[in-house]
Amino acid sequence: MDNHVVIMAGGIGSRFWPMSTPECPKQFIDVMGCGRSLIQLTADRFDGVCPRENMWVVTSEKYIDIVREQLPEIPESNILAEPCARNTAPCIAFACWKIKKKHPNANVVVTPSDALVIDTGEFRRVVEKALRFTDDSSAIVTIGIRPTRAETGYGYIVAADQLQTDKEIFTVDAFKEKPDKETAEKYLLEGNYFWNAGIFVWNVRTITSVMRVYAPGIAQIFDRIFPDFYTEKENESIKKLFPTCESISIDYAVMEKAQEIYVLPASFGWSDLGTWGALRGLLPQDKSGNAMVGTDIRLYESKNCIVHTSEEKRVVIQGLDGYIIAEKDDTLLICKLEEEQRIKEFSK
């Protein structure tokens, strides 16, 4: 199989301000304090699934240098610069049409750059199973995460019929928007609702033909760009035509409309790390429930906090319960965890 991985890395991670900024968003930051940024961890978990020369990154023009620095093994021609943000459907089309130019039978995994996976061995097993399923078929597979709680922050995939040929794979009945708490609790009890991780697997022939049916405007634009890939005209063509794409997610453009959509439910310790609270739940905690990333953090009479600081700063905290304390460069945030939905407001 000619396997390829497309890493989507154009977001700005505004909910993780001040650690994540428009100049250096969270996918390029060592969020976990492990010595690797989230995009580096994303690439690492696909080692063994495909070689680095078959990995692709789609990102904003202003992050190209950061990607080159953090992922030097990925060829420069595989780092694709979006002239402007147009959501995930044009982002994915950009990568898949370019891959198809030199790899017409490529099997592709599309993944966000800023999620966390704990069990990388199980992750690879699941992804490789999906790749085998899509290699010689017109199927699209999405990885569904088995829910561990009634989560209101994720969209859901509803599984329908189990395949007779592979008991791990199901047809998809529907995609659901982020639910309220009562609905999320119902989903958890139903047993056939899975978190939408935004990880998709398909053959490049399949996605290009499906987009011609369900997202013809975007497909036509990339059909026009296609002859210019790998030529001196490529950058000019992208800058001229990419901004004319409709701004739409791959879920709305394709996944909710196409016919042969399947879900492969999985459990590999996935989190999209969308909030400070989610990060606190994944980091090691002291006996008082405090999670810390930094080299010199001292807490006194404090509990249930998350502290994230740059390496050279000494931080001393006394008497706080349930707070975010985050410092980067010349900015310090001190905010109640229960009020973290207001961080976008604070960062303006």
Predicted regions, residues:
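Conserved core of the sugar-phosphate nucleotidyltransferase
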Residues: 120-242, 262, 312, 336
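Residue-level signal for inorganic ion chemistry
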Residues: 39, 95, 114, 157, ...
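Left-handed beta-helix
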Residues: 204-348
